[in-house]
């Protein structure tokens, strides 16, 4: 089973190819101020082992650098994404999931349905059925439960000073939909932390 993947595209002559598949927001990354990445320069590999990868890149946007570490675990993986900027900006960490939630959202969180992400350009118009999750006051961690084939999964993430959104977005083929997690922060320097675990190993 596939949890997440790079979509490639639906054909270079397709409208959705240029409006979504080749756009920053369709990837598992951080979007700054609703804009596409402005640099396509390669990053720097800091370390690489059989179970981990640590890499960074400077000037993804003007005066913005990324560093990402991924560590495989015996029952899942840990993903850490650090963002640094010279000034306060709006950060959206987006993670697309080829799976469906396996939980009752209305009894677990306060939810605000038909929400807006505030952007319509650079692929944001393709996010549909947007729900804002409002965890209990003072919560520092959010746990979501998923079903992927015969597997039961849990994703946990740090949500201090974070707005949490869930949405549907096009997959490839575009008739399929993915579930997109969007973690929004306003900051100069922040680090996102997400861990995925298989519960029924």
Residue ranges and their predicted role:
Residues 1-6:
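Catalytic-core region of carbohydrate-active enzymes that cleave or remodel glycosidic bonds
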Residues 10-201:
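CBM-like, beta-strand-rich accessory domains located in the C-terminal region of large
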């Amino acid at each position: 089973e596939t949890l997440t993947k790079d979509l490639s595209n639906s054909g270079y002559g397709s409208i959705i190819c240029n409006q979504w598949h080749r756009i920053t927001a369709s990837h598992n990354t951080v979007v700054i101020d609703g804009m596409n990445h402005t640099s396509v320069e390669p990053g720097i590999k800091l370390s690489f082992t059989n179970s981990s990868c640590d890499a960074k890149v400077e000037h993804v946007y003007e005066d913005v650098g990324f560093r990402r570490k991924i560590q495989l675990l015996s029952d899942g993986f840990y993903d850490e994404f650090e963002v640094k900027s010279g000034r306060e900006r709006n950060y959206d960490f987006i993670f697309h999931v080829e799976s469906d939630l396996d939980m009752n959202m209305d009894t677990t969180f306060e939810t605000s349905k038909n929400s807006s992400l505030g952007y319509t350009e650079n692929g944001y118009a393709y996010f549909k059925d947007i729900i804002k999750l409002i965890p209990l006051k003072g919560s520092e961690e959010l746990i979501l439960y998923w079903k992927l084939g015969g597997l039961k999964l849990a994703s946990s993430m740090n949500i201090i000073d974070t707005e949490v959104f869930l949405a549907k977005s096009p997959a490839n083929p575009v008739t399929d939909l993915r579930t997109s997690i969007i973690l929004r922060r306003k900051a100069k320097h922040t680090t996102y932390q997400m861990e995925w675990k298989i519960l029924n190993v």
